[in-house]
């Protein structure tokens, strides 16, 4: 069916047909091809991105920033290019996401720095943490305040205490680590 077919269908079914005013004409566009679908997805992405920029979030390249409607972002957060924010992700205030980030169902506190190329799912990061570059957080991970997870570090169901550092080349799986601990390179838990 085409969107315009709705009028004839409604009349055949003896339904009431009336004109309505829409504030955003993009909401009434039909999708009849893959090209139309891509245009509509861009329209929706632009609308969501505009909402966040008006709320005080900086998007360095809105054309490559993908934010789902369910995401929440704190004021004065800066989001770099090629970032995908999905699901129930909540990002605090004054965070910096350098770019090429894929976040799904994340809870991120204030003043967190996510360096280039991070993948994160179903985890929590407390205030002031620094993550990446090239870090991977898998479900069930909780990073305390001021934790540093460096390059090529992966964590799964890891509970990492405040101030702890795993600077590079480390796997933290199914583990609880106390505060102010330094994890050496090449560590596998």
Each predicted region: which residue ranges?
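Terminal amphipathic alpha-helical/low-complexity segments used for targeting or macromolecular assembly
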Residues: 1-64, 69-71, 76
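Structural signal for interior beta-strand "rungs" in well-ordered beta-sheet cores
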Residues: 58-189
């Amino acid at each position: 069916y085409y969107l315009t077919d709705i009028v004839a269908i409604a009349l055949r079914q003896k339904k009431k047909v009336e004109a309505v005013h829409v504030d955003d004409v993009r909401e009434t566009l039909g999708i009849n091809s893959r090209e139309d679908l891509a245009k509509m997805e861009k329209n929706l992405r632009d609308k969501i991105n505009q909402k966040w920029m008006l709320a005080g979030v900086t998007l360095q390249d809105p054309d490559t920033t993908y934010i789902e409607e369910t995401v929440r972002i704190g004021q004065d957060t800066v989001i770099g290019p090629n970032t995908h924010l999905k699901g129930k992700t909540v990002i605090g205030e004054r965070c910096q996401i350098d770019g090429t980030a894929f976040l799904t169902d994340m809870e991120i506190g204030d003043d967190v720095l996510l360096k280039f190329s991070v993948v994160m799912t179903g985890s929590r990061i407390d205030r002031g943490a620094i993550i990446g570059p090239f870090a991977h957080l898998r479900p069930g991970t909780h990073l305390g305040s001021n934790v540093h997870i460096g390059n090529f570090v992966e964590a799964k169901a890891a509970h990492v205490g405040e101030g702890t550092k795993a600077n590079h080349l480390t796997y933290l799986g199914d583990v609880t680590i106390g505060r102010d601990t330094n994890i050496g390179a090449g560590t596998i838990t």
